[in-house]
Swiss-Prot record:
Family in the record: Belongs to the major facilitator superfamily.
InterPro entries to which the protein is assigned, alphabetical: MFS (IPR011701), MFS_dom (IPR020846), MFS_Efflux_Transporters (IPR050189), MFS_trans_sf (IPR036259)
Keywords attached to this entry: Cell membrane, Membrane, Transmembrane, Transmembrane helix, Transport
UniProt keyword S-adenosyl-L-methionine, yes or no: no
A GO cellular component annotation in the UniProt record: plasma membrane
Chief location bin: membrane
Species of origin: Bacillus subtilis (strain 168)
Membrane topology field: Multi-pass membrane protein
GO MF term list: transmembrane transporter activity
Protein name in the entry: Uncharacterized MFS-type transporter YfhI
UniProt-annotated location(s): Cell membrane
Transmembrane segments: 10-30, 48-68, 76-96, 106-126, 141-161, 165-185, 209-229, 242-262, 274-294, 296-316, 334-354, 363-383
Amino acid sequence: MSIKNPSVKFIIFVLMICTFSIGYTEYAVMGILTSIANDFHIQVSSAGLLVTAYAASVCLTGPLVTIISVKLPRKPVLLGLMAIFILSNLMSALAPNFAVLAISRILSASIHGAFFAIAMVFASEMVPPEKRAAAAASMNGGLTVALMLGVPFGSYLGDVLNWRAVFSIITALGVIGFLGLMAAVPNRKPKVIPMLMNEWGVFKHKQVLFSFAITILGYSGVFIAYTFIEPILRHSAGFSTVGITGALFAYGLGGVAGNFFAGKVPLPLLTRTMIGVMIGLIGVLAVFPYIAIYPAAAIVATFLFGACAFGTPPLLQTKVISSSEGGTTIAAAVSVSAFNLANALGAWIGGMILNGTGSYSWLFAGGALMTACGLVLSTFAHLSEKKSVYEYQVNKG
């Protein structure tokens, strides 16, 4: 990142620690489901409800908390959100039963969307316009690192120690982030207060509605399978702790590659590229259970799964913003909620499939089917979209 001001760089680094911690607590559960299920003597499918609860909470509370806090000074809001994050993850680490753990996950998720929205705007306000993309990319790097490193090593620690150790580490990271915010972040009101009531017209745009529907249907297919990726790899490939860690790292590495690729796609090719990525995702889901019985093939398949899964969100989010024509604030907020609704829906459907069939293979069949529904909608969107919107955006840029 080419931001030269040392104080600004340190503030963004602190925000990265916070976003890493929040991303870590979101994804880490998927790597320790077996450990949690064994500790509380419940089915793995029941433990998967933790993923559903978290995603549903983000979906419902993110836009609401953001709107409530949008007129307040950034620093106390960020500190308050991180304080809730710390307490909720400490509650997770000490949870005496599954119900308390589920409640703590819902509480932790309640700050997720608001923190990201406020921190993103705050980071962009600290730098000149030409540096805003670099600032946002650096801050969001926390999520990428959480996916690539935090999840696999969280799974490893969960096996070597226990799942409570993972939440203890997340709590400690939250404390570090909180202290960093106290020391580095200036206390000032937002420069621009969005007029959210003027942005509801975004829902009149057909392509925006298409994008939300594609997100909910298509991306839920990812989480039908990914929610249970850790027990799937144990069962199919026979992986031990080290194998699970390597496979989850491969998924994260694939996610980084897919995200990077998606960021390079020109605006006029958004929907067409999205269709191609979704076809690839369906293909990976369809063959995964058949090739994952071979350890080396399982690693490769997991990498491709991550690449296709994380190649989709940037395309959808860019499509939403490009099609919103002035309602980008509410469009972006609802887009985040749509992804988390897909997360919750996928985890719930996956749990039902696992309970009903007792087979991990059917999870991938269900995931491929849901993604195929998203593919059909993407095709309709491509046939009906106005190319002039993207041509305008390109010429404007």
